[in-house]
Amino acid sequence: MKKLALISVFALSASIQAATLDYDSDSFLGEVVKESLTLLPDDYLNSVDDKIIIEQKSFQTDQLFDSEKLCSIDEGVKFGITRKKKITISSKLIELARRIQTNSNCGHGSFRNMLKAVIIHELTHVKDNQEKISINADFQRIVGMKKVQRNSKKRLMNQNSDSSPDAYEFLNLEESLAVNTEYLVLDPEFECRKPATANFLSRKLGIPLKGECQKNFKVIAQSAFLEDNYQLSVSIDPKRIYQIHYLFAGKGQALMSKWGHAMFRLVVCAPFRTVAGPECLNDVSHHLALSYRAYMNDINISYSKGVFGGYPSQLFVLRYLEVQQEYTKFELRDLFSIPLKMTANQKRDFLDLTLERYWTYQGKYYFIDNNCGTETVKHLAMALDDEESRLISSVTPLKIYKDIIKDKNDLTDENIQGLSREQMLEHHYLVESMFSELNDSYQFLRNYMPSFSEKKMKKFLKKTNARARLEDYENFINNSHSMEPKLRKQVAMKLVHLERYLASHFLQDVPKKALQKMNEDKELKEEVMKMGQTLKLLSVQPWEVVNARYGVPTEEEFEIQFPVFISQRKDEIKMSIENQMVNLENILGKSYFAKELNELETLKQIKTLTSEFIYLVNGIK
């Protein structure tokens, strides 16, 4: 028999106006519809004041059910369709849900649960059509839209199906809302696997969190150094984090660095701390940097790919001290660290999104309009109140910095806007580029080294060669025995300081020349590509290190898989470094790298000489 079922039957008050559901309550479908309704809030469809018809029908895609195993269903199979206020569900799915009771380890676990999921999914579409939840700005920021918009049919940038419970969520905003709602209702682990999404949906849909899972706050620190990449697990548990800072690297020389780089710094407390307090600011070795970057595993960087979305945009978790060295030492850029004003709930929301982004997000990097600045603003805006997020209207890292430090915006606990450079240094809001220190060393050494004739260090860096410096150092060491001992020691220290930078600067330039020359030499190209292929083999994603069911791994998944990865990785890294050394020797063996090879050999001699010199003067107090 067919009858009308009032949603208000399930409501606390029958006086609330609500939709009516029209379905065959005596059928198997009707039975599952009623089960599904008990899982939803009583007022779930109160915004809909029309009749909603639920019926079953054969779909053309039913023929893709070539297996009665849930895990073997092909992509593209339609389970349900909503057109205005009419929901149609696949009769084949209903028949399988009625007949097959076995559980599976994929999807929703059984055909019956799959049927419930389809009902919840389609009812969510009806609700969304009325309330427009899928175009909510925070939802778009969480799921990874390029920019907040009014088009709910727009395809998501994030297409990381490896970490998704159902890749159908990436079709558009509407489907993302419906798919994630299915899992929020039916999967007790969802709120721990996709915590930011779960918190948002719970608040907007009125679906309470179950609290039946234990959130795993562990992530794996990434590194530009092969031997350190994915070797250290770290926790971003809010209880262990004192502050979250906006981390801004000043402008660099490269085209893509002209506007600086936007990041975050997590002030993580050392394990021995019992309370997250100001003392944690001293635990610098435990601090982390969150950096949205283009994921590039090509040895040859393509600017056109960077402009047109050819590289994925991902959230990297790096050790703060490595990031500090990257910018202040190697790129000679200032680094600003500004504490953000956040409530405990805002900090939790920020870190939940960090977890979810790290383990699931792979968007598209666009140099102009989806870069480190825009990704950083979206991440921060999701955690802030609407009024606060509107204060950060910029998309470039420098302008974001200026918005954040404005006193009137009240986004920091400190009055930073009017501070002088000296005051910024004193309060540790600024870590200066090493240029000033290096320049001091250079200007000091100009008094003793004839080849240091350029007044400006930048000109010296472009012209200097290791052979001339080696001759200067040898002459100085041989002829300075009568020099005042403390002054001689000072010269030695300055030499080592400058040479460490010059050696690293040289080693960074060699690959650039190899890339420029490789299209002129087939054999060279083969060696360069071998190096690139080796790097690709070792270039893995977080979700490949720990292969979770979906989303953020559980603690059990993490503790089982990560040690196995570490064990396998040791041998791979050793072999990779050996192979790369062979490739590098073959590359430098080319005739047009004779200058570089000679420079490298001379740098080795300088290192030996300066080490001996330091040892010689080391006893001087």
Task: Identify what each model region corresponds to.
Residues 62-64, 68-109, 240-332, 366, ...:
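Glycine-rich catalytic cores of cysteine/serine-nucleophile enzymes that process amide/ester linkages
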Residues 113-133, 178:
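Active-site recognition of the HExxH zinc-binding catalytic motif
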Residues 21-27, 101-114, 164-168, 250-253, ...:
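Second-shell loop/turn segments in exported
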